Regions:
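Short amphipathic alpha-helical coupling elements at transmembrane boundaries
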Residues: 36-46, 138-148
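Structural signature of hydrophobic alpha-helical transmembrane segments
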Residues: 45-56
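C-terminal ends of transmembrane helices
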Residues: 60-71
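Cytoplasmic-side transmembrane-helix entry/capping segments in multi-pass membrane proteins
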Residues: 75-84, 106-108
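Membrane-proximal helix-loop-helix units in multi-pass membrane proteins
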Residues: 96-145
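Extracellular/periplasmic helix-loop-helix junctions in multi-pass membrane proteins
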Residues: 172-185
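Conserved small/polar residues in nucleotide/adenosyl-binding loops
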Residues: 196-197
Length: 198
């Protein structure tokens, strides 16, 4: 029963993070670094954001396998379930929220603040269950172990966040001709979420 409760709390955490993503998308002030690449790819391909999140997260798992090789545990494949669940919740919350957005720049800042709150709350929920890490965190840990063994985990996370954002920016200008989904919120979100965990 306790394990079932942990799964329910874990899924609730993913749902609230996804809800935060939906609010950040509607604010049009930029999504978090984790979701920046899936967002840009979704705009390029015209596919649902949730679908792109799932595919790219599975790509992160494949990179983990290449980096860790035999050190990659079969249990870590559970991240695939996380990828599908989170992708589903992203599409669900986008549907629930629709095109809702508070008017004006101040209203959009409020939307971004709500997004940050939901993301922080969701992360707290799923971390407390000590179940499956999301693929981006798994990739950070894998890179910390194999590529940057002398750096702290948070330093590797910053490197990875910056890398995916830069890739997203390049793809934006190459395929869209303008910057989309990467703005001030892309910087504010990780900083603010980290602060809420202090």
């Amino acid at each position: 029963m306790k394990f079932v409760k942990r799964i329910v709390i874990y899924l609730a955490g993913l749902f609230f993070v996804a809800l935060g993503v939906a609010f950040s998308v509607n604010s049009n002030l930029g999504v978090s670094p984790v979701n920046s690449l899936p967002y840009v790819v979704s705009r390029i391909l015209g596919k649902d954001l949730g679908t792109c999140v799932t595919v790219i997260f599975i790509g992160y798992i494949l990179i983990q396998i290449l980096l860790l090789r035999k050190a990659f545990r079969p249990l870590d494949l559970a991240q695939i379930l996380c990828s599908f669940a989170f992708g589903y919740f992203v599409d669900l919350t986008e549907t629930l929220l629709g095109s809702f957005c508070l008017p004006g720049y101040p209203g959009r800042l409020v939307m971004l603040a709500i997004s940050i709150f939901f993301v922080a709350f969701g992360i707290c929920l799923y971390l407390d269950t000590d179940l499956i890490v999301i693929p981006m965190e798994g990739l950070t840990a894998a890179m910390n172990k194999t590529v940057f063994p002398k750096k702290a985990f948070h330093e590797v996370k910053v490197i990875l966040d910056c890398t995916v954002v830069v890739v997203g920016i390049v793809l934006c200008f190459v395929f869209l001709g303008e910057l989309q989904g990467i703005r001030e919120g892309t910087v504010l979100c990780p900083c603010s979420v980290s602060y809420t965990h202090l």
